[in-house]
């Protein structure tokens, strides 16, 4: 009876919980802090989506950083174009202000209705404008209102709306002026026509093998230019890393590679950044590709559009995806901060109680 028998099974802590493959993809919503499983999952994700190598000559840029850069460039170009439009409109209004006669100008000034804005506008502009502003009743304005009937006025407004829609569609066909980055797609032409990032230009990696003129004039313009960078990308960093290494060896210092390529873009920004349909290798993991192709029907492949700017809908989608990612990353940190703040009062009260007891025990000097 010298040997003591333990209560229960000694191997109970080593027993593993059986996992159900049906719910294996579901993650817990409870943040339990850092753990070895999370660390291993992060390493597996890095190995799956990224191809890091030692002593890389080129620099990397994250997909989220690139999305923020796109939003900034779009906002700055929009403000710049709106400023140019206002100056052009003011110049046009100043040129058309000669339509009003001097007597009408003096009568408006004496009646107290004249203002810098009203003085520069002509009666024709008041008639053609769609805004609900009051018209200046002059002989020329009444004559113009008689000449142009209601039907003619509506037709003119519809023509103006069509012109605005054509201008908005034509604006997407032009790249941003003074864009700080040059985005290059180093895949072949067929892959580029299927799917690419909006504003990217096709530069196949085979161009680097040329002995004469391997770089386009745009690449030479952005090469080591102050305040400008060149960004390369592909599907999974296989081609882009080789192209970036070759270009860095040839003297490019402002070269970046988009980390993850289209594979990470399809996961983080499925809509907004790209045009066309993603390749199958970007949507389905390579291990599950065959089984998934057998089960799920093939979606129709949509070719990429020839647009060089992001529309307002694209920018809204990019902002929504960024906000969702920021919210998902900020919630665990907020929970940790709340737990820390809840612990602070208890520690402070204990410190106060200790200081009060020590002050009572020690004599006052």
Curated annotation (Swiss-Prot):
Domain (Rhodanese): residue spans on this chain: 177-274
GO cellular component assignments = centriole; centrosome; ciliary basal body; cilium; cytoplasm
Which residue stretches belong to region Disordered? 327-365
Please state where this protein is localized. Answer: Cytoplasm, Cytoskeleton, Microtubule organizing center, Centrosome; Cell projection, Cilium; Cytoplasm, Cytoskeleton, Cilium basal body
Keywords linked to the UniProt accession: Cell projection, Ciliopathy, Cilium, Cilium biogenesis/degradation, Cytoplasm, Cytoskeleton, Protein transport, Transport
The cross-references to SMART domains, in alphabetical order and at most eight, read: RHOD
Please note every region of biased composition (Low complexity). 342-365
Q: Which domain of life is it from?
A: Eukaryota
Output the CDD domains linked to this UniProt entry: RHOD
Q: Where this protein primarily resides, as one coarse class? A: cytoplasm
Instruction: Spell out the Pfam families in the cross-references.
Output: Rhodanese (PF00581)
Per the UniProt entry, what is one GO biological process? protein polyglutamylation
Q: Which PANTHER family does the UniProt record give?
A: CENTROSOMAL PROTEIN OF 41 KDA
What the protein does? Required during ciliogenesis for tubulin glutamylation in cilium. Probably acts by participating in the transport of tubulin polyglutamylases between the basal body and the cilium.
Family according to the record: Belongs to the CEP41 family.
- Name recorded for this polypeptide: Centrosomal protein of 41 kDa
What organism does the UniProt record list as the source? Xenopus tropicalis
């Amino acid at each position: 009876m010298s040997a003591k028998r333990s209560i229960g099974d000694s191997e109970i802590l080593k027993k593993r919980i059986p996992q159900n493959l049906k719910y294996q993809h579901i993650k817990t919503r409870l943040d339990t802090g850092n753990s070895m499983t999370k660390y291993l999952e992060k390493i597996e994700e890095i190995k799956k989506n990224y191809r890091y190598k030692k002593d890389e000559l080129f620099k990397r840029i994250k997909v989220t950083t690139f999305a923020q850069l796109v939003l900034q460039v779009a906002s700055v170009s929009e403000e710049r174009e709106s400023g140019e439009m206002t100056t052009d409109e003011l110049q046009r209004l100043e040129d058309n202000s000669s339509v009003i006669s001097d007597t009408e100008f003096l009568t408006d000034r004496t009646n107290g209705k004249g203002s810098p804005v009203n003085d520069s506008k002509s009666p024709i502009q008041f008639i053609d404008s769609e805004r609900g502003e009051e018209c200046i009743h002059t002989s020329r304005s009444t004559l113009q209102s008689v000449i142009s009937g209601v039907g003619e006025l509506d037709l003119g407004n519809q023509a103006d709306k069509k012109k605005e829609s054509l201008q908005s569609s034509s604006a997407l066909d032009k790249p941003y002026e003074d864009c700080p980055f040059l985005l290059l797609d180093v895949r072949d032409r067929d892959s580029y026509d299927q799917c690419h990032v909006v504003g990217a230009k096709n530069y196949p990696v085979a161009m680097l093998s040329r002995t004469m003129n391997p770089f386009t004039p745009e690449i030479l313009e952005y090469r080591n230019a102050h305040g400008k960078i060149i960004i390369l990308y592909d599907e999974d960093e296989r081609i882009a890393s080789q192209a970036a290494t070759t270009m860095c060896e040839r003297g490019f210092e402002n070269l970046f590679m988009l980390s993850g390529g289209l594979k990470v873009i399809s996961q983080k920004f499925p809509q907004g950044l790209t045009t066309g349909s993603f390749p199958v290798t970007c949507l389905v993991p390579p291990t599950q590709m065959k089984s998934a192709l057998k089960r799920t029907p093939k979606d129709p492949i949509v070719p990429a559009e020839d647009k060089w700017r992001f529309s307002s809908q694209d920018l809204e989608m990019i902002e929504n995806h960024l906000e969702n990612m920021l919210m998902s990353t900020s919630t665990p940190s907020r929970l940790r901060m709340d737990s820390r703040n809840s612990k602070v009062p208890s520690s402070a009260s204990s410190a106060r109680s200790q200081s009060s007891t020590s002050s009572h025990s020690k004599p006052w000097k």
